Each structure stands twice: as C-alpha cells, then as structure tokens.
Amino acid sequence: MDNQAERESEAGVGLQRDEDDAPLCEDVELQDGDLSPEEKIFLREFPRLKEDLKGNIDKLRALADDIDKTHKKFTKANMVATSTAVISGVMSLLGLALAPATGGGSLLLSTAGQGLATAAGVTSIVSGTLERSKNKEAQARAEDILPTYDQEDREDEEEKADYVTAAGKIIYNLRNTLKYAKKNVRAFWKLRANPRLANATKRLLTTGQVSSRSRVQVQKAFAGTTLAMTKNARVLGGVMSAFSLGYDLATLSKEWKHLKEGARTKFAEELRAKALELERKLTELTQLYKSLQQKVRSRARGVGKDLTGTCETEAYWKELREHVWMWLWLCVCLCVCVYVQFT
C-alpha cells in the first residue's frame, strides 16, 4: 500500500511538472493589462528609488549627529568662556572693594579682571561665528540631500558680514583692554614711586578728607582707574559688576543643563524628523510595490492556467484530426484493394 501511494504521489508530481513545463501557445501573450501606465513605471523605477531614499535617510541622520557633535564642542567652549567671565566679574568686584585698603592690589585685580573679560568675550565671539559658519555648511549639505530653495548668494553675503562684525568687535575689545591695562600699569608704578601720593590717595578713598590740591593730583595721576573713582561711582560700578556676574552665572547654569541634556540643536531634530518621515514614506511605497507585484503574479498565474487549457484543447483537436485522416486513408486503401480484387 505504501509503495502504491508513493507511486501515485510521484505520478501526480510528474503530471504537475509536465503541466508546469508545458509550452504556452505561441499566439497568446501574457500581459499586465490591469496595471495603469503609472503603476508600470513605478514597478520599474522603485528599486532605484528605494536605494536613493535609503541613502538620503542615512545621510540625514549622519548629518544630524554631526551637527549635534559640533554644537556640543562649541557649547563646551562657551562654558569655558562664561566661566572665565564669572572669574573676571569676581576679580572686578574685589578690585573695587579693595581700592580703599590697597591701591596696588585694586589695580592688579582690576587689570586682571578686564583682561579675563576680554578673553571671554573674544572666545565667545569666535565660537559663535564658527558655529554659525558650521551651521550654514550643514544647511548646504542638507539642501544637497533634499533640495528646497537656493540661498547661496544671500548666505555668502551674510557670512562675510558676520566675519567683519566679529573682527570689529574683537579689535575694539582688545584695543580698550590694552588701553585700560596701560593706564593701570602706569598708575601702579606712580603709586610705588610716590609714597605721599599713595597716602593722599588712600585718605581720599577712605575718608575723603584731603586738600583740593591733593585731590587734583590724585585725579590727574590715576584718571581712568579705580583709584580715581568716587565712592558713589565705586558703588555704582559694584552694582553693575554684580549684575553682570549674576547674568554670567545664570548663563553658565543654562549651558551646563543644556550640555547634560545632550546639547541637541533644533536643526538636527528637524533633520531627524525628516529622516523619519522619509522612512515612513519608504515603508508605504514598499508595501505598494509588493502589492503590485502580487497583483502581477496573480494575473500571470490566471493567464497561465487559461493558456494551458487552450493549448490542451488545441492538442486534442489536432490529434483527433490526425486519427480521422488516418482512418480515411485506411478506408480508401481498403476500398481500392477490394476493387482490384474483384475486377
């Protein structure tokens, strides 16, 4: 029984193979007539489109990561600059506070504070300018991946203006710092070289009780420094320095929090959102492509079955005609033989 079942199974498989291998009729063509021209074009072009979309998605995500990485570096640089500004603010406050007690110490602290403030400002300006330049390069790369609009000329002009403005600010700050430092250095050496002037300066800053002549000498010798400032001017300067110090501390705290959260930029998040949108679009197109492929295969199987049935019918009639002609020839031959025999 088992052998018989195996033979029947093999016979069935052989029959099915013969049906699959049977040639189709030459006068019948397989056509995907149910597909529109747009669907046919889509089936042909989708493999290339799929690779392009995958490449763009990968490029957008890599660009977003690169933007965040660059922003994190500049955030750290800004934190260093802000920390320097905080130290500068503290030194400036100490310079104002110590002016009545020690003129030389006040001058040194004020000079150092001004120098640190300038260094912090220059670092911040350079960092901001470079980051804007990097962001514009990233925007250009993003537009190469997903073209939107051309703003190259305008961006070039803006970039040149940014560099000119940054250079102007740096030169202005450096010039003022050097000028302030020279005044303080000259005042320091005058203070060391003239003890009487130093005593008059100390009395003026502590009690304010000095002669008019001494007051004029102090104002002339130390003009533009903390030693020539009145009490009200020192208080006002201290308030402004304290306000600036508080602002720098708040900025430092904000930058630290931003860095701890990953220091991600809005532009990078937009690129990631665009990549996710393209990924969803690719999934939808892939499903459509598979659906159309299934439709074509189903159509091909149905047409194949029809073609197989048509070919079997034609083969049957061809064989029947051959048998009829063969019997007709036999009958004719038999009739001729009988006729010859009896004549």
From Swiss-Prot:
InterPro entries: ApoL. One of its GO terms (biological process) is lipoprotein metabolic process. Widely expressed; highly expressed in the uterus, fetal brain and spinal cord, also detected in heart, liver, lung, colon, spleen, thymus, prostate, placenta, adrenal gland, salivary and mammary gland. One of its GO terms (cellular component) is extracellular region. It is found in: Cytoplasm. The keyword Magnesium does not apply. Keywords: Cytoplasm, Lipid transport, Transport. One of its GO terms (molecular function) is lipid binding. Residues 1-10 have a biased composition (Basic and acidic residues). Residues 1-24 are annotated as: Disordered. May affect the movement of lipids in the cytoplasm or allow the binding of lipids to organelles. Belongs to the apolipoprotein L family. This is Apolipoprotein L6. It comes from Homo sapiens. The lineage of its organism: Eukaryota, Metazoa, Chordata, Craniata, Vertebrata.
